[in-house]
Regions:
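Metal-associated gating/positioning segment near the N- to mid-region
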Residues: 58-120
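Histidine/acidic-residue-rich, glycine-tolerant segments that coordinate divalent metal ions
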Residues: 103-115, 119-182
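Hydrophobic/aromatic beta-strand patches that form the interior of the parallel beta-sheet core
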Residues: 13, 51-53, 65, 98, ...
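Active-site metal-binding motif and surrounding structural segment of the metallo-beta-lactamase
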Residues: 44-61
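N-terminal metal-binding scaffold of metallo-dependent hydrolase/deaminase domains
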Residues: 1-47
Length: 182
């Protein structure tokens, strides 16, 4: 997991409302972070060891996941890039983002998946590319699903464009089961 950002000093988040989605609990507490790792969660942590951030009545929780985002790169960088989309996502509390393949050209090949992941490698959040079901999202022939998965695609979608040919869709769905895409 990537760190969202590097803080060169220790941090105490004071008076935050911690929400634990796994336990479905909320409680007020402090969090002590040393060298980027949570070391202590308890009330009234006292320390002169670093930055103190008052989180009075603000919610502290795990990062959010966006399973349907449009970052528009490659081809439509005037709308959004992988970098600008990542920075916006991070500012909103998202640590993981699945990006749709409706770019120009579409993300429909192993090379396109690698392009996205190479661009995302140095960014502060985790990018999960979704590959196109069909080449160029035209609905006529399936894309290189296996190659895309081997290179990091987490799902397939033609994102808003129907695969009208039932045989093409059926073949794509059956084939995707070989790659544990359900």
């Amino acid at each position: 997991m990537k760190k969202l950002y590097k803080i060169d000093e220790n941090v105490i988040l004071q008076n935050g409302i911690i929400y634990d989605p796994f336990e479905n609990k909320k409680y007020k507490s402090d969090i002590y972070i040393k060298n980027g790792l949570i070391k202590k969660i308890e009330e009234n942590i006292k320390s002169n060891d670093g930055l103190i951030i008052d989180c009075n009545n603000k919610i502290i929780t795990t990062g959010f996941v966006d399973i349907h985002a449009h970052f528009r790169e490659p081809g439509q960088e005037n709308k959004e890039t992988i970098k600008t989309g990542s920075m916006s996502a991070m500012a909103g509390g998202f640590t993981d983002v699945c990006i749709m393949p409706n770019t120009s050209p579409p993300i429909d090949s192993p090379e396109a998946i690698r392009f996205v992941l190479d661009k995302a490698a140095a960014l502060p959040i985790n990018i999960h590319p979704i590959g196109a079901i069909t080449r160029n999202q035209l609905g006529k022939e399936i894309s290189e699903i296996g190659g895309m998965v081997k290179n990091g695609a987490v799902a397939i979608s033609d994102d808003g464009l129907p695969v009208v040919n039932g045989n093409v869709l059926r073949f794509a769905l059956e084939y995707s089961c070989n790659w544990y895409l359900y």
